[in-house]
């Protein structure tokens, strides 16, 4: 089973906490021990926002700010690589070809951002499409997809299951509201819809949830099912030991 795991920077390393990075590395190693091929994409989180904010005050333009964000995601990727040790490719992949090659030779591929103007949400979806992944999992700081930003709307509805087309519509609505934050961005949602990759969005602050979702189909997040299929999201779990 080929899996792409997208880990938000604030989920992986809040405050650059080594124990949290180690715990996520342990979760990924457990997946590979169970026979999964894994590609991990790491976001920038609060550290990236801090750097971008300071650079903006110093007069950097938007492309330069995006480049700083990409650089920080790759630093976070290096933290995860350090925790994974010899099971991971030794440096962050800088494009999808490098990541795919690492996965084919049996390494854990780890990458951050790729180009300016594209989030690691979208990078994760593109990597899943490029590698023909069986599953794309977003480990975020919220427990799935809601009808609105749950941090802004206490009455936001939590979805346990939706189609990729419905995901696109929901994310588009959320992103129209200034100040609201979606668990994945609109480009990522559109790539998920195009590729038909099965997707889970969940709260990944406890990395055990990542393992349980991938290996056993057990989670409290949101299953995103390819349009036009009625197959259960957790169809692969029956084949796990």
From Swiss-Prot:
Main localization of the protein described in the UniProt heading? cytoplasm
**What's known about how it's activated or inhibited?**
Inhibited by UTP.
- Pfam families in alphabetical order: AA_kinase
- For ATP, which residues are the binding ones? 9-10, 45, 49, 140, 146, 149
Q: Could you tell me which SUPFAM superfamilies the record lists for this protein? A: Carbamate kinase-like
Where in the cell? Answer: Cytoplasm
Keyword check for Acetylation: no
Residue spans crossing the bilayer: none
Extract the Gene3D superfamilies matched here.
Acetylglutamate kinase-like
Which keywords describe this protein according to UniProt? Answer: ATP-binding, Cytoplasm, Kinase, Nucleotide-binding, Pyrimidine biosynthesis, Transferase
InterPro entries recorded: AceGlu_kinase-like_sf (IPR036393), Asp/Glu/Uridylate_kinase (IPR001048), Uridylate_kinase (IPR011817), Uridylate_kinase_arch/spir (IPR011818)
Q: Which Gene Ontology cellular component terms are annotated?
A: cytoplasm
Pathway as given in its UniProt record:
Pyrimidine metabolism; CTP biosynthesis via de novo pathway; UDP from UMP (UMPK route): step 1/1
Identify the EC number(s): 2.7.4.22
Q: Which GO terms describe its molecular function?
A: ATP binding; UMP kinase activity
Q: Which residues bind UMP?
A: 44, 66, 114-120
> Entry's PANTHER family?
URIDYLATE KINASE (PTHR42833), URIDYLATE KINASE PUMPKIN, CHLOROPLASTIC (PTHR42833:SF4)
Concerning its family, UniProt says: Belongs to the UMP kinase family.
Check the record and name the NCBIfam families matching this protein. pyrH_arch (TIGR02076)
Its quaternary organisation is: Homohexamer.
State the name under which the record lists this protein.
Answer: Uridylate kinase
- Which gene produces this protein? pyrH
């Amino acid at each position: 089973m080929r899996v792409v795991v997208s880990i938000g920077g604030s989920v992986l390393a809040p405050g650059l906490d080594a124990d949290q990075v180690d715990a996520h590395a342990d979760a990924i190693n457990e997946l590979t021990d169970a026979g999964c091929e894994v590609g991990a994409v790491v976001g920038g989180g609060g550290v990236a926002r801090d750097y971008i904010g300071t650079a903006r005050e110093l007069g950097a333009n938007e492309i330069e700010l995006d480049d700083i964000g990409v650089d920080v995601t790759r630093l976070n990727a290096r933290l995860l690589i350090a925790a994974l040790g010899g099971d991971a490719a030794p440096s962050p992949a800088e494009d999808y070809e490098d990541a795919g090659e690492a996965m084919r030779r049996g390494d854990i591929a780890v990458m951050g951002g790729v180009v300016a103007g594209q989030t690691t949400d979208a990078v994760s979806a593109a990597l899943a499409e490029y590698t023909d992944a069986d599953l794309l999992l977003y480990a975020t700081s919220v427990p799935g997809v809601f009808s609105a930003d749950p941090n802004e709307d206490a009455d936001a509805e939590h979805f346990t299951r939706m189609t990729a087309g419905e995901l696109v519509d929901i994310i588009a609505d959320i992103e129209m509201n200034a100040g609201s934050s979606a668990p994945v961005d609109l480009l990522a949602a559109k790539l998920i819809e195009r590729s038909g990759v099965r997707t889970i969005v969940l709260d990944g602050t406890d990395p055990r949830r990542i393992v349980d979702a991938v290996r056993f189909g057990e989670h409290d997040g949101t299953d995103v099912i390819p349009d036009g299929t009625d197959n259960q999201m957790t169809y692969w779990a029956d084949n796990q030991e």
